[in-house]
């Protein structure tokens, strides 16, 4: 320790009190501080007063309510010499680029920054010790309205609580355009509101929008990369021909397009939203999710002037997902009006008709609503939504028209053969459920329920009207295919297959009141063969993809069984799991499969080895393998069949 008093007189004048003690600079402290050392040790209030008095004062403003504490601030960044006490700059406002120095607000009884800074401030490390306000880390940051369009604290609070959702929150690209003051009621507690944007975040930090810090009512979007980390196949013109023994990652897994479609179907089926004013339970169903967002008033004609709503619901009976059509404010006094049409339509089974699962009247919506429940198909859209909207990008060609015609004819044949009629046949009531162009007629039985007591209904007349409705549906699709907007009944003006025109003309013929499915299908019987061939090819493709996943499901069950019995707490004190126990081979086999190491002790990640061992274990082959302990002092020779029996018996004992 260097004594500051060596070679000096302890009774010297106080002229050395402004000189920094060398012990503080070298060692960080001075043991003679309380024994008469006359030099400055950084804790003298007089020194602080002298430091701040070096800056002349010219004007003042309202003093701060709360002083900045650099020790408790998350934005405090100490310099290289933490022992050296720096001047207190906590009372100074944050410097804003682009603003004149003379226009910076001054503090009462404090320093004022003039056009020329004092040498003492220029020489001190102000950058390392000057505190900076970080609005992104402060929970009390409340911006007010400025010229840049930033909402005030009251408006922002109203937006976050849903009271004023119409207030936008734009963020200017240049945060230095507006002059910034001090935040209102924030960390520094200044009485006047902020007149601009806060300082930018530190380099490397991502700016955070205050609104995004609060949870939203809608679930987050999902990325496909969460489910498959392999790169997609290149375009067909960039593919390199492979040898018979070569494989690509896609050949080891399910097709990317099919996997993506199935994953999105699962996401759509399990997606829920806040129920809002909807009831918790309606009949035997819960978790109502609105599905129809189009709000078309023209649909009232289809339901005898009643409004309708569409919901996705979860069944309390079997746990499956269905969709429910609600007809608002239906006055039904006769129970047969609901039960009879349901019994008639619920037994229909066709590949192109959605199954009617339930029909009931409920007052859960504070009115008398008719609810009809059907099978649910995720991501399905009507023909109108798929091809009829102006912004639709789905491809429509002549082959799709033939496929739609064949499938709708199958649906009509099933309905007419059961003595019924599709009175609601429209392209808004036909949904596309999958590829290639698979469709289903939905909302069956609704018309018969609403018009149960209508007199003068003739089944033959209604069935003949179905052919006219089918012609109108097909002409709507033809219009979208040809890009024309002419009258629907003028089929001759469209450039399509002449045979397809002939089919539509047969459906539109009002002079023929005895149209039937048998005569109609004779017009395009050879087209039915091509549609059947396409659907059969698609079914074989799906079966091939499913056969690949069969192995994954089998091995997944086996891995679940292994992990259920391996590494349990009770096995640590059970003698059967010791090296001399009968279950010790399970531990060695688990390490042999998943914890492989090479000769140098490096971990080996060999998926082929894992699949080979698990396949042999699942099959229970008689092949023997040698399992060695980690210390290589003991080994066990055992067959896969014996291992399988041992694992099965252990798992059964665990589940009993």
Swiss-Prot record:
Motif (PABPC-interacting motif-2 (PAM-2)): 128-148
ZnF (C3H1-type) ranges: 15-44
Places the protein is found: Cytoplasm
GO BP term, example: mRNA processing
Signal sequence range: none
Coiled coil: 526-564
One GO MF term attached to the UniProt entry: poly(A) binding
SUPFAM superfamilies, alphabetized: Protein kinase-like (PK-like) (SSF56112)
Domain topic, free-text comment: The N-terminal zinc finger binds to poly(A) RNA. Contains a pseudokinase domain. The protein kinase domain is predicted to be catalytically inactive because some of the residues important for catalytic activity are substituted and it lacks the equivalent of the binding site for a peptide substrate. However, it has retained an ATP-binding site and ATP-binding is required for mRNA degradation, stimulating the activity of the PAN2 nuclease in vitro.
This protein's name: PAN2-PAN3 deadenylation complex subunit PAN3
Species the sequence originates in: Kluyveromyces lactis (strain ATCC 8585 / CBS 2359 / DSM 70799 / NBRC 1267 / NRRL Y-1140 / WM37) (Yeast)
